[in-house]
Structures are given as C-alpha cells and as structure tokens.
C-alpha cells in the first residue's frame, strides 16, 4: 500500500513528521490497523485512545501517555479529532490532567496546558457513528500553534479555572465554565478518587479532573485552516 510502514524511527524534524501525516490522509483505520497488525475494537467507548495509538505507530511517537509531548524532541503533541461530514468536531479534545493540589505559584507560562498546546499536529478522523470504525478515513493534517488571540483566550480560562481549584471550589466547576477551555471529571469509574482542596482549605477526595478544549474552539481552528 502507499502509506508508511508502522513503527518507523522517531521523525527527525517537523517537516518529516508532517509528511508522514500527509501520507496517512485518505487511508482508512482498517487499512492502517491491518498494516500494524492491531485488532480493531468494536467501538471506541472502552478504547478512547485507540485511534491516537494507531496513528502514533505510523508517525514514530515515543512518549505514550507521559506528561511530555508525543514528540518531545520536536516539542509537538499529536491530537486526533473526530469530525462529522461537514468537518466539524464531534467532541471536546482532552489536553491533560488538571493538578488539584500543590498549585501555589503556578503560572500559565509554566503550565502543562500551555506546554501541551504549544505545537500540535491535528489529524481529523471521520467520527460519525454510522460509519464502521474500520471504514473511517484519516483527513489532512494540520500543524498548529496558538496565535496571540487564541493564547490569550486559553490563558484567561486556565487562570479562572486554576483560581477556583486553588480557592477550594473545584466541586463547583461545571463544563460551562471557560470560553474555550473546560474542566471536567476524567475517570473510568467513580471510585477513582484523588486529593483536592476543599472550601475550608481542608483536604478532600474528588474525581480526577482534566482540561478539555471546547468544540467551538477546535471547530473555529479547523475551519480557519481548511476553509470548511
């Protein structure tokens, strides 16, 4: 087939990574899974990270789910984004786990969110449920860094959410907080609790939280670059 073989060495530079991603455009997940000898799950409910893991095998990513970027040598994070027939995102995009304790003195400039979003390789993937997983195709890639306006919106939301966490209001935060960035529970089950700060400054147990990009933000980003 015309696409890359799986498990290449890590890309040497941004251009090589982007060219690998371009070669995947138009391929189906079934073709790529067969080439990588990976079993295709029945659906993505229990295997949310499967598409990203599959693409990492063809792009040469090494970081896995560590806090660093997927391509740490290049400072690039890989984000797959399921889209509908009109090219609009079907779900929010996970950025990273939110720190709920030990946040004194933390700033936007040194935050995990900013680090993860400094340079992103976006790869759209057909995501409508009526398309069987194996038949869903990969779209054209996009290498992106936030412009000044996007960075300002992200910083403002991050600071607002982190202030609420530090002040002990984590349980009051809903997915409606934030213009482009939201904070919501991230746990496979409701028994996986983590320590946080309560309203009186006392330690409490709560669900782990994650930062997510809202669909309005990623939708505008894709539309601007692809003229969707």
UniProtKB/Swiss-Prot annotation:
Transmembrane segments: none annotated. One of its GO terms (cellular component) is cytoplasm. One of its GO terms (molecular function) is endonuclease activity. The keyword DNA repair applies. It is found in: Cytoplasm. One of its GO terms (biological process) is DNA modification. The keyword DNA repair applies. It comes from the Bacteria. InterPro entries: DNA_mismatch_repair_MutH, DNA_rep_MutH/RE_typeII_Sau3AI, DNA_rep_MutH/T2_RE_sf, Restrct_endonuc-II-like. Sequence-specific endonuclease that cleaves unmethylated GATC sequences. It is involved in DNA mismatch repair. Belongs to the MutH family. NCBIfam families: mutH_TIGR (TIGR02248), PRK05070.1 (NF003458). This is DNA mismatch repair protein MutH. It comes from Serratia proteamaculans (strain 568). The lineage of its organism: Bacteria, Pseudomonadati, Pseudomonadota, Gammaproteobacteria, Enterobacterales. The gene is mutH.
């Amino acid at each position: 087939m015309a696409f890359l073989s799986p498990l290449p060495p890590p890309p040497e530079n941004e251009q090589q990574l982007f060219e690998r991603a371009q070669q995947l455009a138009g391929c189906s997940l079934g073709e790529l899974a067969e080439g990588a000898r990976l079993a295709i799950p029945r659906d993505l409910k229990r295997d949310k990270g499967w598409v990203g893991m599959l693409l990492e095998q063809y792009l040469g990513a090494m970081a896995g789910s560590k806090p660093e970027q997927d391509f740490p040598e290049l400072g690039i994070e890989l984000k797959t984004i399921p889209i509908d027939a009109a090219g609009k995102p079907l779900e929010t995009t996970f950025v990273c786990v939110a720190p709920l304790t030990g946040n004194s003195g933390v700033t936007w400039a040194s935050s995990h969110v900013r680090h993860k979003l400094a340079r992103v390789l976006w790869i759209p993937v057909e995501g409508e449920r009526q398309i069987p997983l194996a038949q869903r195709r990969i779209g054209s890639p996009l290498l992106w860094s936030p412009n000044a306006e996007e960075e300002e919106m992200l910083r403002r939301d991050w600071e607002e959410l982190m202030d609420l966490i530090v002040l002990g209001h984590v349980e009051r935060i809903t997915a409606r907080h934030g213009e482009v960035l939201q904070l919501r529970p991230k746990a496979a089950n409701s028994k996986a609790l983590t320590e946080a700060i309560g309203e009186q400054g006392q330690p409490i147990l709560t669900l782990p939280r994650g930062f997510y990009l809202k669909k309005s933000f990623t939708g505008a980003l894709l539309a601007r670059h692809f003229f969707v």
